[in-house]
Amino acid sequence: MYDVAIIGAGVVGSAIARELSKYQVNACVIEREEDVCNGTSKANSAIIHGGFDATPGTLKAKLNVRGNFLMDELARDLDIPFKRNGSLVVCTKDQDRSGLEKLLEKGTANGVPDLRIIEREELIAMEPNLSDDVTCALFAPTGGIVCPFHMTMAFAENACTNGVKFFLNTQVDTIEKNGDSYRISTLHTDTKNKETFEAKVVINAAGVYADVFNNMVSENKLHITARKGEYCLLDKDAGTHVSHTIFQLPSKMGKGVLVTPTVHGNLLVGPTAVDVDDKEAVNTTASGLDSLAATAARSVKNVPMRQVITSFAGLRAHEDSNDFVIGEVKDAKGFINAAGIESPGLSSAPAIAEMVTDIVKGLLPLEKNPDFVGTRKGILRPDTLSLEERNKLIKEHPE
């Protein structure tokens, strides 16, 4: 029997696994896909948000700011590509400046440091390609960009190093209370073999399917809506078109279409925001991609959309409460939700991991792992090495 079983190996599930591995705990992660980071975590804006948009007092606000704070140390220890490039929320001539002032108030209440509103003259010096209609912007210097793939893999690999077991190609079919534990029935999607797991504590980090698993064990039903966002990724030749992450004023559907550099030197434009019934609907559409160019032009001019090298879509897990749903389920002792993790979920993942681990510590007698290894060497990319460095590597590893 496992002490803890985590459902879902996205960035949240993997971050929780890594945080739990700091303790002497028999834990596993169950993931239906063939690798980690194959759901929501693989198709998003790759942004570490400052934390100014979330409503003060919500979990989104608290955990975004905390997660942002943790990123420098995590990037160093786990070798995660991360850069604090800063973000700008721009206001145009036909918009009300009061929207920026409200964001500034919210961000200040949330504890976001160094926020300020800057005027067009300073803005254009920072970002020459901003639209001619942009009049001012909220500047958040703590905003950043990250690689969600490397971030998730870093958490998962470090968790594995410290003893957490990952079961991939393993689809959860049912979860049942079994005395003081839970019985998790699964199907191995590659072999079609069935396997049953027993765990004292179950952590539900299943993205758009988190409501399905919650509703198997609880009368307190959740409803997760899959909110599709389409993106265009541009060639590295376009990667310097902007240097900051450029947001538009947010709406009830999200933070709007952004234009941002990536940590790999490309330019990313997106997302759209359309609620869909199909939780597997990650297809792109002509109308969605066409709308990106028009909408992005409101904040950034001359975005070189002819240099698009690929397009993709991802699904955000929107819960009806409009906040993260994190905590032990009242009528299902030992079942912990990490549900409704939409934006700013990537930014908040390290802090969500801390919060969930604290909940587990209230359910199980956890002791520190004296052998915990807190660092990890990232994936080597030969294309980033000099000729001398590549030759040295070849000599060291001729195989």
Task: Place the predicted regions along the sequence by residue.
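Conserved Rossmann-like nucleotide-cofactor binding loop
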Residues: 12, 35, 209
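Glycine-rich FAD pyrophosphate-binding loop
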Residues: 22-42
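Helical element adjacent to the flavin cofactor pocket in flavoenzyme catalytic cores
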Residues: 138-200
